[in-house]
Amino acid sequence: FNKFGKARLYYEMSLEEQDQLFESTKKNVLPTITQMNLKYAISAKNRARTVAGVSILSTMTNRQFHQKILKSIVNTRNAPVVIGTTKFYGGWDNMLRNLIQGVEDPILMGWDYPKCDRAMPNLLRITASLVLARKHTNCCTWSERIYRLYNECAQVLSETVLATGGIYVKPGGTSSGDATTAYANSVFNIIQATSANVARLLSVITRDIVYDDIKSLQYELYQQVYRRVNFDPAFVEKFYSYLCKNFSLMIFADDGVVCYNNTLAKQGLVADISGFREILYYQNNVYMADSKCWVEPDLEKGPHEF
């Protein structure tokens, strides 16, 4: 009887009906309600967590819209986002080797975002939606895409929440039960890491930089950030390869491990843990305590937690 749980209604729809529903979300905003539930788990920590159960209509239409990019994230190996990669059959070893390779004078560090789902700024959650939807250039018109964004914001960002008998409007942040939560958190994580590096590199006094290539990179970055209206894709590739070489990332939702070049970090050319703290403080409004982050100079020991 209950073989699909509460989702039974959706799964009994034919594929044509599912497509019709999806098409209607490109012209209308579906009104849905999200239910807040207390998470039931055995934990050493003395605290309650909540899980937001997003409506099946919202979940399925969002997944249908983002399906291509989500599948490509899941099926791509040796990329910064490791969602979908197995840790068995040598997968974990492979991920760590891939993280460390090519980085000179490597040091590992990791962090944990305090109150990640609750503290995420609305603008960054919207940005994550836009980044995930960036491939929809040929298949949808602009108005269809903007309605998809409206739907996603109405159902994930500031939707109506049913909590213990009262109905509230959520002020923002991520819904933990949304279909794209893990992916959006990963995008957010990459944005924070990149922001930390951009801020750190721009804050260095140019005459103190001993490497000429990094000096010119800093100048170009300054031009891109402060002088230009439209960014230069070639520079984005250049900066990306600089980060890959000196600030290698491994990301799973809001967890992350970084292998960075310690020589450059001491000169302030790539971000270290203090750079992360600063970015979190002014971009996420949370303070990251010592207990939330770790740095490990000895690669033999590996990451502390991931």
UniProtKB/Swiss-Prot annotation:
InterPro entries: DNA/RNA_pol_sf, RdRp_CoV, RNA-dir_pol_C, RNA-dir_pol_PSvirus. It comes from Turkey coronavirus (strain Minnesota). Residues 115-173 are annotated as: RdRp Fingers C-ter. The replicase polyprotein of coronaviruses is a multifunctional protein: it contains the activities necessary for the transcription of negative stranded RNA, leader RNA, subgenomic mRNAs and progeny virion RNA as well as proteinases responsible for the cleavage of the polyprotein into functional products. Keywords: Nucleotide-binding, Nucleotidyltransferase, RNA-binding, RNA-directed RNA polymerase, Transferase, Viral RNA replication. Residues 76-114 are annotated as: RdRp Palm N-ter. Belongs to the coronaviruses polyprotein 1ab family. Disulfide bonds: none annotated. Residues 1-306 form the Nsp12 RNA-dependent RNA polymerase domain. Residues 306 are annotated as: RdRp Thumb. Residues 106-268 form the RdRp catalytic domain. Residues 1-75 are annotated as: RdRp Fingers N-ter. It holds the Pfam family RdRP_1. Residues 174-306 are annotated as: RdRp Palm C-ter. This is Replicase polyprotein 1ab.
